[in-house]
């Protein structure tokens, strides 16, 4: 729907390789199926590329973007504005860790992609989201292959584990 658009990147952002993003979304299509209506949380939004991809692929998806960097939020707003998605995009300048209890219980799918040098924050976030998320929630955790961590609790089932270059993706599902 939004193909061919170049996304702006905040300074220091690390975009996901196009090949990796396409492969990831093909895997997610197989997991979430034909459901158009999804509540998605792009927790460490950066440029907003993951949430925007969902807005493009799922015309009824609602995406909440959070990031604690003003430059990232400005970039997400710039990238989302020409898409004319209205209320389907909710952009919040906030630390994702402080919004878990408000956002995670309503999310069907959560993207976790903190800066690679902050991998421990990703691990803490995944642990805390596991408490707040509904059973069946899907979580995608992108990590640096050099600093890779598995979830250290039994709240998540690993559905997929794929590596593309430096990026390693875990696709998890909240267990009962």
Residue ranges with predicted function:
Residues 1-176:
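Class I S-adenosyl-L-methionine-dependent methyltransferase catalytic core
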